[in-house]
Amino acid sequence: RKYFLRIYLLSVLMGAVQFSFYNIGFALVRPDGFFPQNQMLASFAILLVALQGFDWCARKKWGRGLAAVLIPILSPFIVSALMTASSNPIWLFTLNLLSFTVLPQHLFIMDGGTATLLFGIVLYLFRKNRYLQIAAFALTCVLWDIARVLLMMPGLCLSDFFTVAYEWMELFAVVPMLCYNGTKGRGSKRFFYWFYPVHIYVLYALSFALYR
């Protein structure tokens, strides 16, 4: 619970920063239109809720389990329908604010999002068998990063998979996964919570200052 709360609260703060770039922080947007859109922590928060749901289902707590699995998966479609159904600017502003902060939606996230939710669930479901887990991960990579992309953008050529649609390269993660011995390494958990947001905004500030 503490781990989830840390991830979630940081994701809310970073989501609020991103929302401000879209709505009130125009002067801080780089002249070429770029600004940080890093919401990986929001992706993790959504995934953790879904995984908790699978755990509850495994313990036959079906009500809360199915709710925890289905709500994070389906909520973006509900929010999108609510946005489409109304042109009220205050209502739309509120829905956008909630979607960037306290109620993140996987379909709206540029950094991770739906892919993180999908891959996280696949890894969790096959967690009891290392080799089956890795095979499932590789198959999901092929289907999501190659087959899906070809269906969505049929005009892609081979070079595009190295310059535009390069997400398939996460297949190479199979190598360290095979080498992992299953034990937790040394590290400072507090360092991560500071480093992740700080390095993003420091690097952005430098790029903003040096931009020509």
Regions picked out by a protein language model, each given a short descriptive name:
Residues 1-212:
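Alpha-helical transmembrane segments and their immediate juxtamembrane cytosolic regions
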